Amino acid sequence: AEVEARPGETIWRVAQRRGIEIPHLCYSPEPGYRADGNCRACMVEIEGERVLAASCIRKPTNGMRVNTLSDRAVSARRGVFELLLADQPDREQAHEYDSTFWSWAGKLDLTNSRFPAGGAPAPDPSHPAMRVFLDACIHCNLCVRACREVQVNDVIGMAYRGHQAKIVFDFDDPMGESTCVACGECVQACPTGALMEATRVDADGVDKREPLDNVDSVCPYCGVGCQITYRTRHNRIVVVEGRNGPANEKRLCVKGRFGFDYVNHPHRLSEPLIRREDAPKDASTEIDPANPYTHFRTATWDEALDFAAAGLRRIRDRDGGRALAGFGSAKGSNEEAYLVQKLVRTGFGTNNVDHCTRLCHASSVAALLEGIGSGAVTAPFMACKDAEVIMVIGANPIENHPVAATYFKQAAQRGAKLIVIDPRGTALKRYASHMLVFRPGTDVALLNALINVIIREELYDSAYIERFTEGFENLRKRIAPFTPEAMAPICGVDAETLTAVARAYATSAASIVFWGMGISQHVHGTDNARCLIALATITGQVGRPGTGLHPLRGQNNVQGASDAGLIPMVYPDYQAVGDENVRAKFEDAWGTPLDPNAGLTVVEIMDAANAGKIKGMYVMGENPAMSDPDLQHARAALAKLEHLVVQDLFLTETAVHADVVLPASAWPEKDGTVTNTNRQVQMGRQALIVPGEARQDWWIIQEIAKRMGLKWQYTHPRDVYREMASVMPSLDNISWERLDAESSVTYPCDGPDEAGHEIVFGDGFPTASGRARLVPTEVLPPD
């Protein structure tokens, strides 16, 4: 048959696309893996050529005639597999019974080898999550490429010579004692079972061969939003595998692959609890989470929900809605966040609702809304693939966003300039072209110096400024004193380095900036973000491939929870509560009058609780007794509350002070959507059943709402999502059904069958003027 090859395709790829199977061992078709051509399992015969060709690396040419099933090709493949089979453990004793190797051996009708077996290396059980069985290793080097080229961790290598050659970790250390970060990429790549998850083999290293159920979902940890597949048995997660999602391309980190033991932890709450009458609250109270019955008693769901709602109603009816407050969670779903804020606004009668974004990127969102009219990123972190300069400031992605960091490291390896700016000198400095270690709290001085150089040396984009910004002349005037020479003694970075970095960022064809909570968790966090907005917009480094502004979101649904309205001064999609037209729209949608006044923030709520102004709280999935600034202050505030309802997985430090504790569902136990740092709305799916009497979070919220007098009738998270989509323009053309089919859609999206816009603001900004607002900043001493 005559076939056409696409540009850059190999013979193997063309054959795969045509449904023709060619064996492969050292080659992985997954994203990020280059072909090596060293195993010779994929040999094909090309007419007119004397020797066989490795189809994984050979590219077709016009008129080439390829025979994938010639006698020579098939014989060569069988020979390769028979040689490798000689050193493999017997299949019944295989570490992975259905590995790529054994699957292909079966298709080639090979079960044993005529060749003598070599010595079997001892297994390495030193790692808590993985096992190493070099008796199954075929030296395909996939694990080396996985570690060095995909994850860019540089732990695995090939050492020694001849028959002594083998895969090693660092300097031939046991895996568990090496610098391995346990991302598990090598395990996922290994075609033979030489590297295995510890949960899949027995004490002798033999595959348990348990039938596993597969459920596709999304990782519940950081804001990257990796797509995953849970592989479960008997209501336990046995293995987690990476899926080819838009944010991870099958990559995972240690948490995403191995961090799910908490779901079946013995301390999980499995029945509602009500505080005992003989256990008064105290700020210093500590309770053993394994034995909450010293301070709580068990209750039925009806009793617990009635008790929870009665206390909240009592305070609302006696003192008014503003005596109540609610905290939602950035670790739950969009639907749960939406329901929490709706409950507080319509059931409590107040806008006193917030979540942990207040303590992380609220300053970034404030500056972004002010400057460019949107609180979300302008480009995904994948945009670094097209960038010539990548600036990372106030973030430690190798530890906090490990999968995103793999793309930064890869970009640096291919030649992009990586500028890392941080007082600590993070792990990313190893890959940096410029590492600026500055004095803590002097962010504005440093960033203003960069802007000063760009304006003074006229490195800015005049056409872009004229068309898409406002306030440039004021910025030019206000930035004049902030020369690198004047700022160097303040920030601790020499003027020459500041100048070089400014020039590199401004003059590259594509520069992108990423920032984290290192610059947002400041009294001048908003000013820090204003500086970055000015830096990007005056140089025209927004709205094109490889450019943009990207605050790296911390938790898995900080973006989505904020979008869903879990913020005291805005309704869903950042629509101001003080705007009469906006408020009228939500009053019509929700069927009740709404408070026209902005609510209190997390910090203000805790202050008000300490002062006795906030008397009751509902806390769903948050732990302010551990996450708020000044823990003694936070715990004292919680202990003073007349009525505290906590909904969580464990008896947290906050739940210790609760009047009623409601056992909730973990992420693998629920359906729902989340929105990652890239603006990708993604579908999470239930893989496990909740333990004991625990319940789905959306159900618990609705049951409280009903007891607060609301007539909610949701039957599934999809009902909640559809209501959200009706009041949130950002979800236009992103239906629940589409998400269920596609798993991920980026907003904004122009049509039900169109891909969302990954890169935005190429033709202006969603501000009243259509322009970015440049806001000058001043150097302020740290508080």
Short names for language-model regions:
Residues 232, 241, 252, 545, ...:
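Non-catalytic terminal/interface segments that mediate subunit docking, oligomerization
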Residues 153, 164, 214-216, 225-227, ...:
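Active-site lining segments that contact anionic ligands and/or coordinate catalytic metals
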